[in-house]
From Swiss-Prot:
Belongs to the universal ribosomal protein uL22 family. InterPro entries: Ribosomal_uL22, Ribosomal_uL22_bac/chlpt-type, Ribosomal_uL22_bac/org-type, Ribosomal_uL22_sf. One of its GO terms (cellular component) is cytosolic large ribosomal subunit. This protein binds specifically to 23S rRNA; its binding is stimulated by other ribosomal proteins, e.g. L4, L17, and L20. It is important during the early stages of 50S assembly. It makes multiple contacts with different domains of the 23S rRNA in the assembled 50S subunit and ribosome. The globular domain of the protein is located near the polypeptide exit tunnel on the outside of the subunit, while an extended beta-hairpin is found that lines the wall of the exit tunnel in the center of the 70S ribosome. GO terms for biological process: translation. Part of the 50S ribosomal subunit. Keywords: Ribonucleoprotein, Ribosomal protein, RNA-binding, rRNA-binding. This is Large ribosomal subunit protein uL22. One of its GO terms (molecular function) is rRNA binding. The keyword DNA-binding does not apply.
Length: 136
């Protein structure tokens, strides 16, 4: 690794130490379905977001709820105190496409239709309100 690349990688690692996030990788649902759930809670206060996810009928909401609880626990672990209501917000959440499994399904007249079984990666950042305003 070159010197410039190493320095920028070290800066990136230091920046991540001050951020509070959780990642969920290789979720076996399509990114499009997961983005619908992510858009529901973007920018919300965490207790309200947990309520929205708990009562959502979407299958992906249960996975994002668990991820949000993990991000809150990470924040509490790094700050060595419990989060108070109204203190934490979902500052960022994004969904990236993961690996796609390609399968074939038999089709009429000897053909085969391709099936793409998609997966995704979700990254969720939490922070205080002051951090939320600084990033925007």
């Amino acid at each position: 690794m070159g010197a410039r690349k190493k320095i920028s990688a070290e800066k990136r690692k230091e920046a991540l130490k001050t951020m509070y996030f959780a990642k969920l990788q290789n979720v076996p649902t399509s990114p499009r379905k997961m983005r619908l759930v992510a858009d529901m809670i973007r920018g919300m206060e965490v207790n309200r977001a947990l309520g929205v996810l708990k009562f959502s009928s979407k299958e992906a909401a249960a996975r994002v709820e668990k991820l949000l609880r993990s991000a809150i626990a990470n924040w509490e672990q790094k700050n060595e105190r419990k989060a108070e209501s109204g203190e934490l917000f979902v500052t960022q959440i994004f969904v990236d496409g993961g690996a796609t499994l390609k399968r074939m399904r038999p089709a009429p007249q000897g053909r085969g239709y391709r099936i793409r079984k998609r997966s995704n990666h979700v990254t969720l950042f939490v922070g205080a309100k002051s951090n939320n305003e600084d990033q925007n």
